[in-house]
Swiss-Prot record:
Residues 176-287 are annotated as: A. One of its GO terms (cellular component) is nuclear envelope. It is found in: Nucleus inner membrane; Nucleus envelope. This is Nuclear envelope integral membrane protein 1b. Disruption phenotype: Morpholino knockdown results in defects in eye development, reduced expression of early eye marker genes rax, tbx3, six3 and pax6 and reduction of cell density at the neurula stage. Co-knockdown of nemp1b and ran elicits reduction of cell density and eye defects more significantly than the individual knockdown of either one. Residues 326-434 are annotated as: Interaction with banf1-a and banf1-b. Keywords: Developmental protein, Erythrocyte maturation, Membrane, Nucleus, Signal, Transmembrane, Transmembrane helix. Pfam families: NEMP.
Length: 434
């Protein structure tokens, strides 16, 4: 019984301790909320400089128009030393930050300290506030608000458009497969390292926790690299080249081992994924929400309406062909007639040989009806169906100098001459005037 009471007392003490750590401590170290919060308003094209911790707020003064689809509003903070920047939605959030909280105290150490940062403001946000906290008293910083066309948003929109309309072609391209694999390998090298280490670990090891940590570390490292890319390229370019070479080669090796996608279902999944990413990029890059939704819907309908348009066009062609009057057939020339006759004759003779050589052919019945069985057997074995004498007679009669052609030519000429012959006119004899 005493043990139960003692255990309850320990649990109660632990709960009180956690409550004191998480909840605000107004009696110990709470800043006075009655003190008025000093906030500096930010205006477009105006820069302010300070050397102490301040609170800044920007309030929207105009409604976004259709011409602001790729317009960007950003707050740039540049300082001589490291600072801590926190973005909130309104002034009430700033007042809450002024109140000491143990959870906020520990989480503030996880916030990134930067000396040059950009904060992007939503065009539809009524108010955006920023708190700048100095870690060193001897620090000067400047805050500027700017608005204008962002070429990066337009580039992202074009990339989304390309991925959506050419997703099928890209999903089947080997160049896209290898380039995407190498790029993903360079950006997620930490995750790939964690995956390789998981293969060496026992099956009961906490791999999923390690994988989650790898994702978090990879995202954090990628964020740091992109924010400090210019400094890295100028100061540590040797290490950057070595890193890109090693990681790029390893990524290419992995892509080469597994090879491009060949299964049609896998290609379709990649195609749908690229199209979905393209729609998301188009939606994110356009700052006006209703215009973004309209563009996404139009792009989707345009892509899907391709098949109904093809079906309608095919149906229209069929209806048009049925209703159209048949035109006069084109007559063959003499050369085309001879070629076609030769081809069709050879084809018919081959079919006749195959029919006579088939097991179902009544050979004895056929031989009993023909006059020259030996000639028929030679024909079935591949010999010509005409004798040299028959060929000579045919050429003599129907060749270029044959009698049939001469009769046709001279017969036509005689008919023409007969038609052209005109009887001489008969004039009446005039009477004598005498």
């Amino acid at each position: 019984m005493a043990g139960e009471v003692e255990g309850r007392g320990c649990g109660f003490s632990l709960g009180v301790l956690v409550t004191l750590l998480v909840l605000p401590l107004p009696s110990l170290c709470t800043l006075s909320t009655e003190k008025e919060l000093h906030v500096i308003k930010l205006y477009e094209g105006r820069m302010v400089r300070y050397n102490e911790s301040r609170n800044f707020c920007y309030q929207r003064t105009y409604e976004p128009k259709w011409s602001d689809v790729w317009t960007k509003i950003q707050i740039r903070i540049n300082s001589t030393k490291m600072i801590r920047v926190t973005q909130v939605d309104n002034e009430e959030k700033l007042k809450e930050m002024e109140t000491f909280n143990m959870f906020d105290f520990f989480s503030s150490f996880l916030k990134e300290k930067l000396n040059d940062t950009f904060i992007y403001v939503n065009l539809y946000s009524n108010k955006t506030c920023v708190k700048v906290h100095l870690t060193d008293t001897d620090t000067y910083y400047s805050v500027a608000l700017s608005r204008g066309f962002d070429p990066r948003l337009f580039f992202v929109f074009l990339c989304g458009l390309l991925l959506f309309f050419y997703g099928d072609t890209l999903s089947r391209s080997q160049l896209f497969f290898y380039s995407t694999g190498i790029t993903v390998g360079m950006l997620a090298s930490m995750l790939i390292l964690v995956f390789m280490l998981s293969k060496l670990m026992p099956k009961k090891s906490p791999f999923f926790a390690l994988l989650l940590g790898g994702w978090s570390v990879s995202i954090y490292v990628i964020q740091l690299v992109f924010r400090n890319l210019q400094a890295i390229c100028s100061e540590y370019w040797q290490y950057l080249i070595v890193y890109l070479g090693i990681v790029g080669f390893v990524s290419f090796a992995f892509c080469y081992i597994y090879g491009p996608l060949e299964n049609e279902r896998s290609i379709n999944i990649l195609n749908w994924t690229l199209q979905l990413i393209g729609l998301l990029l188009m939606y994110v890059s356009v700052q006006i929400q209703h215009i973004a939704v309209t563009i996404v819907v139009i792009a989707f309908c345009t892509k899907q309406i391709e098949y109904p348009v093809q079906w309608i066009y095919i149906l229209y062609r069929k209806i048009k062909l049925k209703r159209a009057k048949p035109g006069p057939p084109r007559l063959l020339t003499e050369e085309e007639y001879r070629k076609q006759a030769d081809v069709e004759t050879r084809k018919a003779l081959e079919e006749l040989r195959e029919c006579c050589s088939s097991p179902d052919f009544a050979a004895w019945k056929t031989i009993s009806r023909i006059q020259s069985p030996k000639r028929f057997a030679d024909f079935v074995e591949g010999s010509s169906h005409l004798t040299p004498n028959e060929v000579s007679v045919h050429e003599h009669e129907y060749g270029l100098g044959g009698s049939f052609l001469e009769d046709e030519l001279f017969g036509e000429d005689s008919d023409v001459e007969e038609e052209m012959e005109i009887e001489p006119p008969l004039y009446p004899i005039p009477r004598s005037v005498f």
